[in-house]
């Protein structure tokens, strides 16, 4: 397996399958990995679901009984009970995104659904890579700047 191999396992609940651009999701993942200089083969899981699905996950894992736009579940290397083969891709974790939030937030912020979807994928990826906007105002500013740099590289900046 080469360093350039990336596995993005995308699951879309049926009502949204016709609207979700899986190629854009893969591009956003790859661009984030490249710009963050993540080497080697990696694997990421992405679920596109609805507000109810995100609310269930938010309640189960964060104790917040409300829907949200994106949740990230980073894989901690030391928590695994299994030994990975040396050539296996590094599993970064999973990202869950509400398509209903993609649509609503795109309208609210006055940009395309594509930009909003890419933003949420990039946001989730940065969380999987250790960024945390809730740690401090400086960390939030750093993460926001990085998100915009990656979106600009994708041709989806706020100015475009």
Swiss-Prot record:
Which sites bind Zn(2+)? 123, 127, 133
**The protein's name:** Endoribonuclease YbeY
Q: Which InterPro entries does its entry note? A: MetalPrtase_cat_dom_sf_prd (IPR023091), YbeY (IPR002036), YbeY_CS (IPR020549)
Known EC number: 3.1.-.-
Metal-binding as a keyword of this entry, yes or no, is: yes
Domain of life of the organism encoding this protein: Bacteria
Could you tell me which PROSITE patterns the record lists for this protein?
UPF0054
On whether Isomerase is a keyword of this UniProt record, the answer is: no
Q: Mind listing the UniProt keywords for this protein, alphabetically?
A: Cytoplasm, Endonuclease, Hydrolase, Metal-binding, Nuclease, Ribosome biogenesis, rRNA processing, Zinc
Cofactor binding notes:
Binds 1 zinc ion.
Span-the-membrane segments of this chain are: none
The record's Gene Ontology biological-process terms are:
rRNA processing
Q: Name one GO cellular component term.
A: cytoplasm
What is its subcellular localisation? Cytoplasm
Role of this protein? Single strand-specific metallo-endoribonuclease involved in late-stage 70S ribosome quality control and in maturation of the 3' terminus of the 16S rRNA.
Question: Which cofactors must be present for this protein to function?
Answer: Zn(2+)
- HAMAP family in the record, alphabetically? Endoribonucl_YbeY
Q: Which family does it belong to?
A: Belongs to the endoribonuclease YbeY family.
What would be an example GO MF term here? Answer: zinc ion binding
């Amino acid at each position: 397996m080469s360093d350039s191999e990336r596995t993005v396992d995308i699951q879309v609940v049926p009502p949204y399958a016709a609207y979700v651009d899986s190629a854009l999701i893969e591009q956003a993942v790859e661009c984030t990995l490249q710009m963050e200089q993540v080497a080697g083969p990696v694997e990421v899981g992405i679920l596109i679901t609805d507000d109810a699905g995100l609310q269930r996950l938010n309640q189960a894992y964060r104790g917040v009984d409300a829907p949200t736009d994106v949740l990230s579940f980073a894989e901690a290397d030391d928590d695994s009970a299994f030994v990975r083969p040396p050539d296996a891709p590094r599993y970064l974790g999973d990202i869950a995104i509400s398509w209903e939030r993609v649509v609503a937030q795109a309208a609210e912020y006055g940009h395309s659904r594509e930009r909003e979807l890419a933003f949420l994928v990039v946001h989730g990826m940065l969380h999987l890579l250790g960024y945390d906007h809730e740690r401090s105002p400086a960390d939030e500013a750093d993460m926001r700047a990085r998100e915009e740099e990656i979106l600009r590289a994708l041709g989806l900046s706020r100015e475009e």
